[in-house]
Amino acid sequence: ALKDINYVIANIPDHALAYYNRGIIYENLGQPTQAIQDYSHAINLQPDLLEAYHYRGIVRYGMKDLDGALADYNKAISLGLKSSAVYFNRGVIFHQKGQLSDAIESYSRSIEIDPSNARAYYNRAISKLIVDNYKEALQDLEISKRLGYSKAAEIISQYY
Protein backbone atom coordinates (compact mmCIF):
# COMPACT_ATOMS: atom_id res chain seq x y z
CA ALA A 1 0.00 0.00 0.00
CA LEU A 2 2.82 2.42 0.83
CA LYS A 3 4.43 1.80 -2.55
CA ASP A 4 1.14 2.58 -4.31
CA ILE A 5 0.59 5.77 -2.32
CA ASN A 6 4.16 6.90 -3.01
CA TYR A 7 3.53 6.34 -6.72
CA VAL A 8 0.40 8.52 -6.59
CA ILE A 9 2.24 11.27 -4.70
CA ALA A 10 5.16 11.16 -7.14
CA ASN A 11 2.79 11.58 -10.08
CA ILE A 12 0.16 13.85 -8.50
CA PRO A 13 2.05 15.87 -5.87
CA ASP A 14 -0.97 17.99 -4.95
CA HIS A 15 -3.20 15.01 -4.09
CA ALA A 16 -4.23 15.80 -0.50
CA LEU A 17 -5.97 12.49 0.10
CA ALA A 18 -2.84 10.60 -0.92
CA TYR A 19 -0.84 12.41 1.77
CA TYR A 20 -3.64 11.83 4.27
CA ASN A 21 -3.74 8.11 3.48
CA ARG A 22 0.04 7.84 3.62
CA GLY A 23 -0.12 9.54 7.02
CA ILE A 24 -2.44 6.77 8.19
CA ILE A 25 -0.01 4.16 6.87
CA TYR A 26 2.94 5.81 8.61
CA GLU A 27 0.93 6.03 11.82
CA ASN A 28 0.12 2.31 11.61
CA LEU A 29 3.80 1.57 10.94
CA GLY A 30 4.77 3.39 14.13
CA GLN A 31 6.36 6.34 12.32
CA PRO A 32 4.64 9.31 13.98
CA THR A 33 6.96 12.03 12.66
CA GLN A 34 6.32 11.00 9.06
CA ALA A 35 2.59 10.69 9.79
CA ILE A 36 2.44 14.24 11.15
CA GLN A 37 4.37 15.54 8.14
CA ASP A 38 1.92 13.90 5.75
CA TYR A 39 -1.18 15.00 7.66
CA SER A 40 0.22 18.54 7.72
CA HIS A 41 0.94 18.43 3.99
CA ALA A 42 -2.58 17.16 3.31
CA ILE A 43 -3.99 20.03 5.39
CA ASN A 44 -1.86 22.57 3.52
CA LEU A 45 -3.20 21.24 0.23
CA GLN A 46 -6.80 20.93 1.43
CA PRO A 47 -7.49 22.95 4.61
CA ASP A 48 -11.02 21.53 4.91
CA LEU A 49 -9.80 17.92 5.17
CA LEU A 50 -11.25 17.62 8.66
CA GLU A 51 -10.16 14.08 9.48
CA ALA A 52 -6.54 15.04 8.81
CA TYR A 53 -6.70 17.41 11.80
CA HIS A 54 -8.27 14.66 13.90
CA TYR A 55 -5.69 12.04 12.98
CA ARG A 56 -2.79 14.47 13.36
CA GLY A 57 -4.19 15.23 16.81
CA ILE A 58 -4.19 11.54 17.66
CA VAL A 59 -0.54 11.21 16.65
CA ARG A 60 0.42 14.37 18.53
CA TYR A 61 -1.35 13.04 21.62
CA GLY A 62 0.62 9.81 21.30
CA MET A 63 3.79 11.90 21.21
CA LYS A 64 2.70 13.67 24.44
CA ASP A 65 2.07 16.97 22.59
CA LEU A 66 -1.19 17.73 24.40
CA ASP A 67 -1.37 21.34 23.26
CA GLY A 68 -0.77 20.40 19.62
CA ALA A 69 -3.35 17.63 19.79
CA LEU A 70 -5.87 19.94 21.45
CA ALA A 71 -5.29 22.58 18.76
CA ASP A 72 -5.94 19.98 16.05
CA TYR A 73 -9.12 18.71 17.71
CA ASN A 74 -10.37 22.27 18.19
CA LYS A 75 -9.62 23.12 14.56
CA ALA A 76 -11.45 20.03 13.30
CA ILE A 77 -14.45 20.93 15.46
CA SER A 78 -14.41 24.60 14.42
CA LEU A 79 -14.43 23.53 10.77
CA GLY A 80 -17.50 21.38 11.38
CA LEU A 81 -16.31 17.85 12.13
CA LYS A 82 -19.15 16.05 13.91
CA SER A 83 -17.28 13.12 15.40
CA SER A 84 -17.87 11.46 18.74
CA ALA A 85 -14.22 10.41 18.74
CA VAL A 86 -12.80 13.92 18.30
CA TYR A 87 -14.90 15.25 21.20
CA PHE A 88 -13.96 12.23 23.31
CA ASN A 89 -10.26 12.71 22.59
CA ARG A 90 -10.54 16.40 23.39
CA GLY A 91 -12.22 15.49 26.68
CA VAL A 92 -9.30 13.22 27.59
CA ILE A 93 -6.86 16.08 27.09
CA PHE A 94 -8.97 18.54 29.06
CA HIS A 95 -9.17 15.99 31.88
CA GLN A 96 -5.41 15.50 31.87
CA LYS A 97 -4.89 19.26 31.95
CA GLY A 98 -7.24 19.56 34.94
CA GLN A 99 -9.87 21.47 32.95
CA LEU A 100 -12.68 19.28 34.23
CA SER A 101 -15.66 21.42 33.20
CA ASP A 102 -14.29 21.50 29.65
CA ALA A 103 -13.71 17.74 29.82
CA ILE A 104 -17.29 17.14 30.96
CA GLU A 105 -18.60 19.36 28.17
CA SER A 106 -16.53 17.52 25.55
CA TYR A 107 -17.64 14.10 26.80
CA SER A 108 -21.24 15.35 26.72
CA ARG A 109 -20.86 16.37 23.06
CA SER A 110 -19.33 12.97 22.32
CA ILE A 111 -22.36 11.31 23.92
CA GLU A 112 -24.80 13.54 22.00
CA ILE A 113 -23.24 12.36 18.74
CA ASP A 114 -22.98 8.71 19.82
CA PRO A 115 -25.24 7.82 22.76
CA SER A 116 -23.79 4.28 22.80
CA ASN A 117 -20.26 5.50 23.62
CA ALA A 118 -19.81 3.72 26.95
CA ARG A 119 -16.29 5.09 27.47
CA ALA A 120 -17.53 8.67 27.11
CA TYR A 121 -20.08 8.07 29.88
CA TYR A 122 -17.36 6.47 32.00
CA ASN A 123 -14.85 9.25 31.48
CA ARG A 124 -17.49 11.90 32.11
CA ALA A 125 -18.36 10.10 35.34
CA ILE A 126 -14.73 10.15 36.47
CA SER A 127 -14.52 13.89 35.79
CA LYS A 128 -17.77 14.41 37.70
CA LEU A 129 -16.47 12.37 40.64
CA ILE A 130 -13.44 14.62 40.89
CA VAL A 131 -15.66 17.73 41.09
CA ASP A 132 -17.84 16.01 43.74
CA ASN A 133 -20.88 15.57 41.49
CA TYR A 134 -21.54 12.07 42.80
CA LYS A 135 -25.18 11.74 41.79
CA GLU A 136 -24.59 12.50 38.11
CA ALA A 137 -21.39 10.46 38.15
CA LEU A 138 -23.31 7.42 39.36
CA GLN A 139 -25.90 7.93 36.61
CA ASP A 140 -23.14 8.00 33.99
CA LEU A 141 -21.47 4.94 35.49
CA GLU A 142 -24.78 3.04 35.43
CA ILE A 143 -25.26 3.90 31.75
CA SER A 144 -21.67 2.96 30.94
CA LYS A 145 -22.12 -0.35 32.77
CA ARG A 146 -25.39 -1.03 30.94
CA LEU A 147 -23.57 -0.36 27.65
CA GLY A 148 -21.04 -3.04 28.59
CA TYR A 149 -18.03 -1.13 29.88
CA SER A 150 -16.61 -3.34 32.64
CA LYS A 151 -14.58 -0.60 34.35
CA ALA A 152 -17.84 1.17 35.18
CA ALA A 153 -19.07 -1.88 37.07
CA GLU A 154 -15.77 -2.00 38.99
CA ILE A 155 -16.07 1.64 40.08
CA ILE A 156 -19.70 1.19 41.09
CA SER A 157 -18.90 -1.84 43.25
CA GLN A 158 -15.85 -0.12 44.75
CA TYR A 159 -17.37 3.25 45.64
CA TYR A 160 -21.15 2.87 45.74
Predicted features and spans:
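Alpha-helical tetratricopeptide repeat
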Residues: 1-160
